[in-house]
Amino acid sequence: MPAPIRLRELIRTIRTARTQAEEREMIQKECAAIRSSFREEDNTYRCRNVAKLLYMHMLGYPAHFGQLECLKLIASQKFTDKRIGYLGAMLLLDERQDVHLLMTNCIKNDLNHSTQFVQGLALCTLGCMGSSEMCRDLAGEVEKLLKTSNSYLRKKAALCAVHVIRKVPELMEMFLPATKNLLNEKNHGVLHTSVVLLTEMCERSPDMLAHFRKLVPQLVRILKNLIMSGYSPEHDVSGISDPFLQVRILRLLRILGRNDDDSSEAMNDILAQVATNTETSKNVGNAILYETVLTIMDIKSESGLRVLAINILGRFLLNNDKNIRYVALTSLLKTVQTDHNAVQRHRSTIVDCLKDLDVSIKRRAMELSFALVNGNNIRGMMKELLYFLDSCEPEFKADCASGIFLAAEKYAPSKRWHIDTIMRVLTTAGSYVRDDAVPNLIQLITNSVEMHAYTVQRLYKAILGDYSQQPLVQVAAWCIGEYGDLLVSGQCEEEEPIQVTEDEVLDILESVLISNMSTSVTRGYALTAIMKLSTRFTCTVNRIKKVVSIYGSSIDVELQQRAVEYNALFKKYDHMRSALLERMPVMEKVTTNGPTEIVQTNGETEPAPLETKPPPSGPQPTSQANDLLDLLGGNDITPVIPTAPTSKPSSAGGELLDLLGDINLTGAPAAAPAPASVPQISQPPFLLDGLSSQPLFNDIAAGIPSITAYSKNGLKIEFTFERSNTNPSVTVITIQASNSTELDMTDFVFQAAVPKTFQLQLLSPSSSIVPAFNTGTITQVIKVLNPQKQQLRMRIKLTYNHKGSAMQDLAEVNNFPPQSWQ
């Protein structure tokens, strides 16, 4: 049989192929020759054939038939054969294939070989693809090589030990004695790998972390020697001595100093020295400075040192390299909550990043800009962010508009400024705002009594001939319906009033009704606005009747139903029309400690509940009717029942005008005292369960299995169930939240929503902190009334802070045991 071609010739031949098909033909031909050689047990050219097979594997062609040949090469006594065999094993084998277990004995023999290079090959292979079984069998040999005096083997053994610990964490203590002397080594390779090993052990075990904290002075001394040493050609990179080792030591110091005052104090001086002495003209220096900043911000460092770190990030923002600017913005975003004033000094530079061409930098700059907004700079920051909203790409508009809404609501210097800002957003990016923007703005306008004339005039001007921004048109239609009389009378004092007739107002609302751009919801707003104007205008009532009657035969069912109801109001209940269509009362939002909305899985938003304060005296029949006619839309999610009954005024004629069905919102519990003079609507019996001192639960709870409702990112939520004695329709769910990560989860908030056929009562949690390492749990009780015995479903939302970041997640719970609801 002729000698096979060499690897170099194969590469040259393959590169001459002009098409993919021609290349495949060459590969298949060579693979056939290699298979034939393997079948004939040709030991002479086995090494050459496996090398060619590895090249084909790198090109993406199948090479699995060479796995056993790699094992044969590993068993060979020739170093060249072993080298190719081990390389082939690392490329073609992994722990999912049983073939790799056949290597265990060969690797063990080679770990005890007299030649260091053979031992090095075995260590590399074990550290690359060793399974847990192999690691368990060979850990003793690795630990022995970790204690050898040979630096070449010690650095490889340290990295192999890292892999062993990752695969078999319980073997960690085996390597503890050997690691103590690793930091005394002068060889930088050994130092580097030993720091990697120490880092892995500290991250995986709190006991190891506490044990190695006493090494902080030694690590500080090594780092100081690196930055103070002179030129060393062996380790120098762009004028900096071994930056890779410096970065590794800084990362280990960050882990050791976290939540420990003594360790942090010991490393403060060296961190300041690194931050001030490192050259920033080259990227190598910037990498070290970045790690230094992360370490300073993560440990309990001095305030002056933290300011120095933030100033370094501020200098990064001026760098021409986009990657450096991006990491600076990301780091500032993480630290802005703890060092707000120091970050504020770089506000102008951050705002300039909004004009960057890179979309990633632009997004980070936008997020950081919103984090910097406060009551002192709200006007200037909003000016910049509104300019950004005008010119940014469509993918930014939704987040930017949402951020402006939240900032304006929190820091608005005046109601007029607040209204103007939101109207500017709706005019610029109305089609990108969240669903709750419209009711929130309406609530703001309603509460600003002195701004009604100004607002309705501004909105009227804003939608003249332009209906493209539907949320803006909806708010304008609502305001014109409520305050159209102020628009016509020209009572605006804040700016020059305009002359508008009743017919002109109706013209624009009718234009909204017939516009192709108007959605069904917008048409509903417009039709209701026209109906409300029948009590505010005097000369156009007949025209309003005609418009309403026309839409009584609309193909839009929602619009048709409204028109029919309004026609009935004209014909049968005209004497009640003025009272039913009077102005909306002041609306107040509920204030909760948790988030104010639940973002649904389809991306829509469920607004937070509105709490209506009880009237000062006596029933008020018109208020309920007005609420029913406040056609802002309903929801099919049931409310969270308060722990104390709330008052609800009786309504005369409200049932006739229930145009929406139940208006149900979900949110956190909120109690409102009820005046004695207001008649009460009876609440479900389970509302008083929490106030009773009698045993409320029967023995069937013992047969209800608990479930895991959520398990992700170390957070686990478990549900246990009990059934009420007094009312079998009530299921009491106790949630237990546990945290398996190494850091506490703070500001924990659990929210839940159930379908409309259920009623839900969410009691207060036992705490807002979920302790780390499963050392404690948060408990919270949910009571669910299920009178129809339907299958229980629940949507939950979890929000908490972890590792300095705000976390939020949604989940659907559909695996409730039948015993909990049948």
UniProtKB/Swiss-Prot annotation:
Region (Disordered): 597-628
Keyword Cytoplasm attached: yes
Protein's membrane topology: Peripheral membrane protein
Gene Ontology molecular function terms on file: clathrin adaptor activity; collagen binding; GTP-dependent protein binding; kinesin binding; small GTPase binding
Cellular component, GO, one term: cytoplasm
Effect of M366V: In USRISR; does not fully rescue morphological defects in a zebrafish animal model; affects trafficking of transferrin from recycling endosomes to plasma membrane; no effect on subcellular location in the perinuclear region; does not affect interaction with AP-1 complex subunits AP1B1, AP1M1 and AP1S1
PROSITE patterns: GAE (PS50180)
Function: Subunit of clathrin-associated adaptor protein complex 1 that plays a role in protein sorting in the late-Golgi/trans-Golgi network (TGN) and/or endosomes. The AP complexes mediate both the recruitment of clathrin to membranes and the recognition of sorting signals within the cytosolic tails of transmembrane cargo molecules.
Keywords: Coated pit, Cytoplasm, Cytoplasmic vesicle, Disease variant, Golgi apparatus, Intellectual disability, Membrane, Protein transport, Transport
Pathological association: Usmani-Riazuddin syndrome, autosomal dominant: A neurodevelopmental disorder characterized by global developmental delay with impaired intellectual development and speech delay, hypotonia, and behavioral abnormalities. More variable additional features may include seizures and distal limb anomalies. Usmani-Riazuddin syndrome, autosomal recessive: A neurodevelopmental disorder characterized by global developmental delay with impaired intellectual development and speech delay, hypotonia, spasticity, and behavioral abnormalities. More variable additional features may include seizures, scoliosis, and joint laxity.
Outcome reported for the amino acid change (mutating P243H): In USRISR; does not fully rescue morphological defects in a zebrafish animal model; affects trafficking of transferrin from early to recycling endosomes; no effect on subcellular location in the perinuclear region; does not affect interaction with AP-1 complex subunits AP1B1, AP1M1 and AP1S1
UniProt name for this protein: AP-1 complex subunit gamma-1
Reported tissue expression: Widely expressed.
GO BP, sorted A to Z: basolateral protein secretion; endosome to melanosome transport; Golgi to lysosome transport; Golgi to vacuole transport; intracellular protein transport; melanosome assembly; melanosome organization; platelet dense granule organization
Assembly behavior: Adaptor protein complex 1 (AP-1) is a heterotetramer composed of two large adaptins (gamma-type subunit AP1G1 and beta-type subunit AP1B1), a medium adaptin (mu-type subunit AP1M1 or AP1M2) and a small adaptin (sigma-type subunit AP1S1 or AP1S2 or AP1S3). Interacts (via GAE domain) with RABEP1. Interacts with SYNRG/gamma-synergin. Interacts with EPS15. Interacts (via GAE domain) with AP1AR (via coiled-coil domain). Interacts with CLN3 (via dileucine motif); this interaction facilitates lysosomal targeting.
Subcellular location: Golgi apparatus; Cytoplasmic vesicle, Clathrin-coated vesicle membrane; Cytoplasm; Cytoplasm, Perinuclear region
Cited SMART domains: Alpha_adaptinC2 (SM00809)
Disulfide bonds: none
Family in the record: Belongs to the adaptor complexes large subunit family.
GAE domain location: 702-817
Pfam families: Adaptin_N, Alpha_adaptinC2
